[in-house]
Amino acid sequence: MTILVGTASWTDKTLIESHAFYPPNCNSAEARLRYYTGIFPLVEVDSSYYGMPSASNSALWAERTPAGFVFDVKAFRLFTGHQTEPKCLPKDIQADLPKTDKKNLYYNDVPAPLLEVLWARFFAALEPLRAAGKLGAVLFQFPHWVTATPKSMAHVEHCAERARPLLTAFEFRHESWFNEKHRESTLQMEREHGIVHVIVDAPSDVKNRVHSLWEATSPALAIVRLHGRNAQTWSGAGSAAERFNYDYGDEELEELASPIRD
């Protein structure tokens, strides 16, 4: 068994501005990535959640990293049911959208032909990483308002089919997916589609979280994501940096290491 450890993004603004990780001479995207790969063998690309990724960037990432380095890539926010401002879409897609006064769009607000284009472009953008053997899992994070209903299950399975044959991971943010009624059916769905079940560590006594369920649903991979245990900022209106601002202690890490090894 191989265990890879990495961070969610190597270009996070707060990480760079903290001056706690990168040395002073790492002041370009290339330098930061090359330095990062000397510390960690894995990274999660989160820029692909906020905007569509590009093949040119993927090619540069593949070129600037050593053999065996792995990129997990977050799925674009529109695909996972998140609200998406039109400006987050490519300009040609924006131009072809139906006229609307909505500030935010959701998946079903976008015409099917345009969705086809977005899916195709998303996976084409990952091709340089796949071809280089450096693409890990494509991570779909479903927000807490995507609950375990037949409609949501249909969309989740739709995402699984669209991502095939790439290795795909699902992270659910609403507890209904793993409550007594739906836990087994959710895990069975993941197994049937070869989906990697994402195990989440987060504050224990807060809303809008799924409690850790230590299950492996894919023979290829298991993912554990550490969100931190900062209960005070978890449900607040602050930034993501504030929400996830947490340093795990040695005892907490050892507590997590045991089930990971198992």
Language model feature labels by segment:
Residues M1-D262:
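Residues lining hydrophobic/aromatic ligand-binding pockets adjacent to catalytic sites
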